[in-house]
UniProtKB/Swiss-Prot annotation:
Protein name: Phosphoenolpyruvate carboxykinase (ATP)
Pfam family of the protein (one): PEPCK_ATP
Family to which this protein belongs: Belongs to the phosphoenolpyruvate carboxykinase (ATP) family.
Native species: Oceanobacillus iheyensis (strain DSM 14371 / CIP 107618 / JCM 11309 / KCTC 3954 / HTE831)
Molecular functions (GO terms): ATP binding; metal ion binding; phosphoenolpyruvate carboxykinase (ATP) activity
Family annotation (InterPro entries): PEP_carboxykinase_ATP, PEP_carboxykinase_C, PEP_carboxykinase_N, PEPCK_ATP_CS
An example Gene Ontology CC term for this record: cytosol
Lineage: Bacteria, Bacillati, Bacillota, Bacilli, Bacillales
Cofactor binding notes: Binds 1 Mn(2+) ion per subunit.
Catalytic activity line of the entry: oxaloacetate + ATP = phosphoenolpyruvate + ADP + CO2
Amino acid sequence: MKTVDKSYMKELQTNHIHHNLSVAQLVEKILYRQEGILTSTGAVRATTGTYTGRSPEDKFTVKDEVSDQHVNWGKVNKPIQEEVFNQLLSKVISYLNEKQEIFKFQGFAGSDHTYRLPIQVINEYAWHNLFSRQLFITPTEEELNNHQAEFTVISAPGFKADPAIDGTNSETFILISFKKRIVLIGGTEYAGEIKKSIFSVMNYLLPQQDVLSMHCSANVGQEGDVALFFGLSGTGKTTLSADPYRKLIGDDEHGWSPNGVFNIEGGCYAKCINLSEEKEPQIYNAIRYGTVLENVILNDNSREPDYDDTSLTENTRAAYPLENIDNIINPSVAGHPNTIIFLTADASGTLPPISKLTKEQAMYHFLSGYTSKLAGTERGVTEPLATFSACFGSPFLPLAPSKYAEMLGKKIDMFDTNVFLINTGWTGGSYGVGDRIKLSFTRAMVHSALEGELNSIETITDEIFGLQIPAHVPGVPDELLVPKQTWGNKEAYMKEAQTLALKFHENFKKFTLASETIKQAGPLYKG
């Protein structure tokens, strides 16, 4: 077990700490303290004020002798001095000592007992403590009796920093010290910071134990075959991994160890925008007693959630334990992945709907982490924006992206994993001209990939991107598979495809540590 310096805990008065309250006790506290309100579903709803999403500009990592040589310092991992951290920690503890009551949750991150991290979360707010209880792994009574936290999250949303004095970017701060093994959060009520800070911690610790930490969803078939789904927001990751014929391992964060795949979390933090029972029954029916709804608008009288109302934010969320879903595997551990699917929603309409990747191409596209974001303006003019996020989770990676890519490459080799790139975006033209690829076709492609039907099928090489396109996929029209054939204007297609290829090359320049074979696995067209 890791020896952790917890001298700071001596300064935190304990007579006002509620330890490991039950869901019922926390719901009671939330309502009594007027932190949230009860909804018709039985869930509690809380709002987060100014911050309705993460604050990446306010996230810093302490640069010291422990982190200095390991962390990939830069825009994502901004350094902060140890002295700045220590002073803020002292101030936050003094602030919490003045509170009438605070809340502590003890649990784990990581479903595989070999690699799990014992954690504790100390919260100013009861609703944040319920959120932590639902998102992380709750210990048994025996585990709780022997629990020794190896990482602590301290969350004090009511404490606002003074940048001029405290050395922060703003009144909000998310600070990680790998030496003290503390995450310090202040000035933001957005609960996602608690979840994602522990994910960042696991992305630092797990690779040191030969475990690849991944921002992906995962499910397992009836024969024990495991699939991973990587993809940025809006690519269909949640929709496609929720499959009635396969059991869910988890929806967001996983580790791939020498034993297989395991969920890092014990719950889900699902998007609620436009949620309906018809479209996403699994999520819709999981929202019940004990669930935390974040920034969801309610009907004043009935207290029914209105998932279509985005007046507070489009980033409305529900936090609930995995047990709220019927179709799960418990515990959340499974074997090695047979299939990996990278999802992209390409608005240029030039990437193939499905292609089979070599190991080198898999590492290239993993590092690229490409999708399109659709930026809307008030006049309704939308200009798609090519977005690249390394390893499909750049904001949460303390180490160099190439470290995770190398681990992925080794594991693909070791376990002979098939990797596919599936485009859930546009066909027959770019956004505004073409059409979104039908979900039924995408599901057919995913099904064929998972069933092994495409492993030895004849392929066509894409002339721009160098990708291997299956000549036939059951349930999908053959002409849809080759993007150029779906465009009326072939010249316009070539121009659009070449533009995207150059964006890939431009983005990849930053990966100076990548090997030459990986660099060569990008688009064939180089301008």
